[in-house]
Amino acid sequence: MKMQANQIRPGQVLEHQGKRWTVLKIQLIQPGKGGAFIAVEMRDVDSGNKTNERWRTADTVERLEVREIDCQYLFKDDTGYTFMDKETFEQFSMAADALGEQAGFLQESMEVTVDCIEGSPVSVNLPSQVILQVVEADAVVKGQTASSSYKPGLLENGMKVMIPPFIEAGTRIVVSTVDCSYIERAK
């Protein structure tokens, strides 16, 4: 299925140069001069090799048709991350490198969809947002309120995110799983 490059999301499976690739990370780059483009970090489904590609936002790419399975994340162990198919109750593991940075967002009992090609799992699609707790936040420096200023915050999963100055350690926030950015304070 053809789609525009600006619709690429982590976890999707693309066909590029005759190979199947899982999207690990995306970044929209808007240079001062010229059109915007998408930088995509991908992993080859078969060999595990990684590559980086750049596409203009209007370019079209081929997204592979995959079978999506509704699953529940169970736990992490030496073999990788273990999921359970919600229909058949079968359990299977995926290696940490297959998930990339998405692994940091997994929480026990989280509902996810797993993409399978020819019966083998290749990627995980997370919810677009997760609620995480801020465990460490820098203090606000007085006088920095003239413009919107953000400060670095450390989340319970070990990831860092830029948060507004009113967020303190212990606060639960909503974080985007697409680009690891602060959305709002959790209600």
Curated annotation (Swiss-Prot):
Pathway per the UniProt entry: Protein biosynthesis; polypeptide chain elongation
Matching SUPFAM superfamilies: Nucleic acid-binding proteins, Translation proteins SH3-like domain
GO BP terms in the entry: peptide biosynthetic process
Keyword Signal included in the entry's annotation: no
SMART domains: EFP, Elong-fact-P_C
Superkingdom: Bacteria
GO MF: translation elongation factor activity
Primary location class: cytoplasm
Pfam family, one: EFP_N
Subcellular location per the Swiss-Prot or TrEMBL entry: Cytoplasm
Keyword terms, alphabetized: Cytoplasm, Elongation factor, Protein biosynthesis
Record carries keyword Cytoplasm: yes
GO cellular component entries: cytoplasm
Annotated function: Involved in peptide bond synthesis. Stimulates efficient translation and peptide-bond synthesis on native or reconstituted 70S ribosomes in vitro. Probably functions indirectly by altering the affinity of the ribosome for aminoacyl-tRNA, thus increasing their reactivity as acceptors for peptidyl transferase.
Similarity field: Belongs to the elongation factor P family.
NCBIfam families: efp (TIGR00038), PRK00529.1 (NF001810)
Name this protein carries in UniProt: Elongation factor P
Organism encoding this protein: Rhodospirillum rubrum (strain ATCC 11170 / ATH 1.1.1 / DSM 467 / LMG 4362 / NCIMB 8255 / S1)
